[in-house]
């Protein structure tokens, strides 16, 4: 199994330095990862650094809380696309989901998908905060909104677990017939965990431990 082609090598910590970023990008080249996932302020640099490769530059929108307005998320997406982002990972508004404001969720996903201009849109559900029924409902809303992937986690929930096999399986079973894919992220720190997520249905893995997993 070519694990490197599942991995989006990730650096999203708020105190990430240019040195940290360059290390991530060099490792992405060394291991030929499918992509890197960086904060919006680092998209332009990452795109330039990787310009002679086929490594995707992925960024995050409304991260990590998902509580920005729809309008600001759309503007953030437009700016990230302009700066060279190949794919967008947006954070769902968990509060709106729990309040049953499903039209809001679908509308937000749809508007951000339009702003992606044909690029893949992944919707981060933040599964640590949701019940199984809420995870399934969120996946159904992602289908309605036109998303390309559903994603487990930001990795920023206090005392959160991140990606769990049972959640990845539930997400996969909910979206597979609609053609959506699953990205598992959060807590994937070794080869064993990576393989378990893939076997559960994940096509992408978001992890800061890509080099360790593939060594």
Q: What residues fall within each predicted segment?
A:
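Conserved N-terminal beta1-alpha1 strand-loop-helix module at the mouth
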Residues: 1-82, 137, 141-144
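Structural preference for beta-strand elements that scaffold enzyme active sites
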Residues: 6, 35, 54-58, 87-89, ...
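Short beta->alpha linker loops
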Residues: 16, 38-42, 125, 188-189, ...
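General structural feature for long, well-ordered alpha-helical segments within catalytic domains
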Residues: 20, 24, 42, 73, ...
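Glycine/Thr-rich beta-alpha phosphate-binding loop at enzyme active sites
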Residues: 32, 37, 92-99, 127, ...
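Alpha-helix-loop-beta-strand connector modules within alpha/beta enzyme cores
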Residues: 40, 44-65, 100-122, 126-129, ...
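Catalytic cores of alpha/beta
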Residues: 47, 68-79, 130-141, 166-173, ...
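Glycine-rich phosphate-binding active-site loops on the catalytic face of alpha/beta enzymes
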Residues: 59-70, 82-97, 144-161, 186-215
């Amino acid at each position: 199994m070519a694990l490197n082609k599942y991995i989006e090598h990730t650096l999203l910590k708020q105190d990430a330095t240019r040195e940290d970023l360059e290390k991530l990008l060099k490792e992405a080249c060394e291991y030929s990862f499918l992509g890197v996932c960086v904060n919006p302020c680092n998209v332009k640099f990452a795109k330039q650094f990787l310009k002679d490769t086929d490594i995707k530059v992925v960024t995050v929108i409304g991260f990590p809380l998902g509580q920005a307005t729809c309008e600001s998320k759309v503007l953030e997406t437009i700016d990230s696309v302009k700066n060279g982002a190949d794919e967008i990972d947006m954070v769902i508004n968990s509060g709106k989901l729990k309040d049953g404001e499903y039209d809001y969720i679908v509308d937000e996903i749809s508007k951000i998908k339009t702003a992606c201009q044909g690029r893949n849109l992944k919707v981060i559900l933040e599964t640590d905060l949701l019940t199984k029924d809420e995870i399934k409902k969120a996946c159904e809303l992602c289908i309605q909104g036109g998303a390309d992937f559903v994603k487990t986690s930001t990795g920023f929930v206090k005392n959160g677990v991140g990606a769990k096999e049972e959640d990845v399986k539930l997400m996969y079973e909910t979206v597979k017939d609609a053609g959506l894919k699953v990205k598992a992220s959060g807590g994937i720190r070794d080869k064993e965990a990576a393989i378990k997520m893939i076997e559960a249905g994940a096509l992408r893995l978001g992890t800061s431990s890509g080099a360790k997993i593939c060594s």
